[in-house]
Amino acid sequence: MIGPMSEESSTRVPVTYEHCAHIEGPFYHGTKSTIEVGAEVVPGYGSNFQAGRVSNNIYFTALVDTAAWGAELATALAGNGARGRIYVVEPLGPFEDDPNVTNKRFPGNVTQSYRTRHPLRVVGEVDGWEGHDPDVVKGMLDSLALLREQGLDVIED
């Protein structure tokens, strides 16, 4: 079986630390940071999405588009005007569905987003990835700002 759906039953198989081997890459990590191929991305650094918060997990995805959101939002929230980076990564330990997006607006994990408390090894970089329209990114940033104002910008970490 490849991917988060079981071919026999068409029901989603949740991805947990104990049950993640059925998910195959490639995997991507979108970020504002410049990282060398061969380096390991580890948890324990500041969150890109909440100032002053240390992230206990590293987040990654099986979709370039989802990684693009990570890269674009991280750079926009940093306010540095730079273009984000998308890296091809391999998890060095077990991982699980990202509970911040799984079964939220849509059933399942449509963004194919995962998180781990273990390192991710950078094995390459995605060059020439297509970003989202600036107005769409602004809309997402405005939505995040509204959630923050309402105290609803909760990150399950």
Question: Across the structure, where does each feature detected by a protein language model lie?
Answer:
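Short, polar loop/linker segments at the starts of domains and inter-domain junctions
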Residues: 37-49
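Conserved NAD+-utilizing ADP-ribose enzyme module
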Residues: 2-25, 32, 48-58, 64-157
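Short polar catalytic/cofactor-binding loops
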Residues: 30-37
